[in-house]
Amino acid sequence: MILLEVNNRIIEETLALKFENAAAGNKPEAVEVTFADFDGVLYHISNPNGDKTKVMVSISLKFYKELQAHGADELLKRVYGSFLVNPEPGYNVSLLYDLENLPASKDSIVHQAGMLKRNCFASVFEKYFQFQEEGKEGENRAVIHYRDDETMYVESKKDRVTVVFSTVFKDDDDVVIGKVFMQEFKEGRRASHTAPQVLFSHREPPLELKDTDAAVGDNIGYITFVLFPRHTNATARDNTINLIHTFRDYLHYHIKCSKAYIHTRMRAKTSDFLKVLNRARPDAEKKEMKTITGKTFSSR
């Protein structure tokens, strides 16, 4: 299985090139790039007001207001410090870098810029991990509508944090492959007792969401992660956040890969069958043609 990159490579490569050219004393060049990411996220890299010595990285998330309610602004301020500026119109967060005043730790700055989406997501997880560490119960469940028709729920208890993703399968084939995929997660936990518990429910929401307006339907699935203190403590939580916030994309990416692999195998098998049929086809009988005098025609 393939782990999706947590960081955004386009941001990192673009900034790294800009920093490298600036450090070498090269003349700065204009940049204007707009690109998308999973979950409807949109990025924009540009020179504000046409100033080529400044590079702005902006991100747009449809659900950013929900993340703000869980401390996203504070977390970003802590991580990015003076690089965080007022967002440009149409975007939620903007980072500004001055090529004439390069930071000392360029590699670290570039990497953190590439983690912008992850760091926006991180606030809700850090908040509920902290609730669990402090033994708080009864806190309101976090509800993040991270896609138009899909939702993430986060809830903390004294001994665990429960994260539930709702997801929509486009067709029946996706449901079948998704179930097989989730069964592999259950089997994997038997091999590693430190892995979190993973549950999958189809059509109906899990018991944790019985009192909510969670969607119900034949194409609806719910994936539940039960995270224990060994997954949420200060040492492990960064890696946990890196992995869990991309899980929905990870699942659907592998469903698409599985379907593509199956189609490739089917086409290859069909090609093999056609070769067998062609070999089994009887050769057409050649008729001997003669002239009126009895001579045989010969092909040249």
UniProtKB/Swiss-Prot annotation:
Cytoplasm as UniProt keyword: yes
Which organs or tissues contain this protein?
Expressed in hippocampal neurons (at protein level).
* GO MF annotation: an example: actin filament binding
Report the domain of life of the source organism. Eukaryota
- Which keywords appear in this protein's UniProt record, sorted alphabetically? Acetylation, Actin-binding, Cell projection, Cytoplasm, Cytoskeleton, Nucleus, Synapse, Synaptosome
Against Gene3D superfamilies, the record matches this protein to: 3.30.1460.20
- Nucleus as UniProt keyword: yes
Q: Name one GO biological process term.
A: positive regulation of lamellipodium assembly
Sites bearing N6-acetyllysine, chain numbering: K275, K295
What GO cellular component is one of the record's annotations? Answer: presynapse
Cellular location of this protein? Answer: Cytoplasm, Cytoskeleton; Cell projection; Synapse, Synaptosome; Nucleus
- Family classification: Belongs to the ARPC2 family.
What is this protein's function per UniProt?
Actin-binding component of the Arp2/3 complex, a multiprotein complex that mediates actin polymerization upon stimulation by nucleation-promoting factor (NPF). The Arp2/3 complex mediates the formation of branched actin networks in the cytoplasm, providing the force for cell motility. Seems to contact the mother actin filament. In addition to its role in the cytoplasmic cytoskeleton, the Arp2/3 complex also promotes actin polymerization in the nucleus, thereby regulating gene transcription and repair of damaged DNA.
Q: PANTHER family in the record, alphabetically?
A: ACTIN-RELATED PROTEIN 2_3 COMPLEX SUBUNIT 2, ARP2/3 COMPLEX 34 KDA SUBUNIT
Subunit field text: Component of the Arp2/3 complex composed of ACTR2/ARP2, ACTR3/ARP3, ARPC1B/p41-ARC, ARPC2/p34-ARC, ARPC3/p21-ARC, ARPC4/p20-ARC and ARPC5/p16-ARC. Interacts with SHANK3; the interaction probably mediates the association of SHANK3 with the Arp2/3 complex. Interacts with DNAI3; this interaction reduces binding of the Arp2/3 complex to the VCA domain of nucleation promoting factors.
Q: What is this protein called?
A: Actin-related protein 2/3 complex subunit 2
Instruction: Provide the species name.
Output: Mus musculus
UniProt lineage: Eukaryota, Metazoa, Chordata, Craniata, Vertebrata
